[in-house]
Amino acid sequence: MLDQIKIHNIKQIMLCLMARRCATKAEIVEDTGLSTSTVSSCVNSLLKLKLLVVNGMDDSSGGRRSTIYRVNSAYGCFIGLDLRPEGIQGVVTDCEAQILKRISFPLGGGTAPLHAIMELLNAEIAHNKNVLGIGVGAAGKLDYEEQIIVSAPEFGWQFVHLKEIIERQYMVFTHLDHQINAGAIYEGMMGCARGEKHYLYISEAPGGK
């Protein structure tokens, strides 16, 4: 069992590699601020778990060439859903956050939002056998700690335990967040705000309050 410190270190290394696409151990040390021995130990563990793969050697002009590592994109996939009044939009990504497929389910004609969500997930989980996680972005009032949609007037929802519903049905880890938070987190972790301690994320999308 991994302790919490090692889990944190591995998370930092994985985020570094997802943002850079590939890196040597020295580059990971520089980006994360972790010690050389910590990075080496974590990278070796990730290689054994097949979460990382070797991506060749660097073009060093002298001395020993360094090994380049990257996330094993084929390890599994993730499903992300964006819940909006006009329909459910989503993507399937690999472990490097590269989009493999865009998915959608229009709402209207009496289609229940929860039915649309489950129909999308039924199809994608049947097609992708190694789904590692599901992320859901929703508008409205959310209880982040309990992972509950407290109120979503566009859907007529009150106190919907969406995370629990999805996890019970598919036995796949699911995380619920507000659409705006999800966008801001992505930019901070992998987008244009990566490395910034403070930044402002603005969205003009409907429901972005």
What is each residue range found by the language model?
Residues I99, I103-N122, K129-H198:
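Glycine-rich phosphate-binding loop and adjoining helix at the ATP-binding site
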Residues T24, V53-V54, D59, D143:
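Short beta-strand(s) of the beta-wing in winged-helix/HTH DNA-binding folds
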Residues M1-K25, V29-E30:
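Extreme N-terminal segment that seeds HTH/winged-HTH DNA-binding domains in transcriptional regulators
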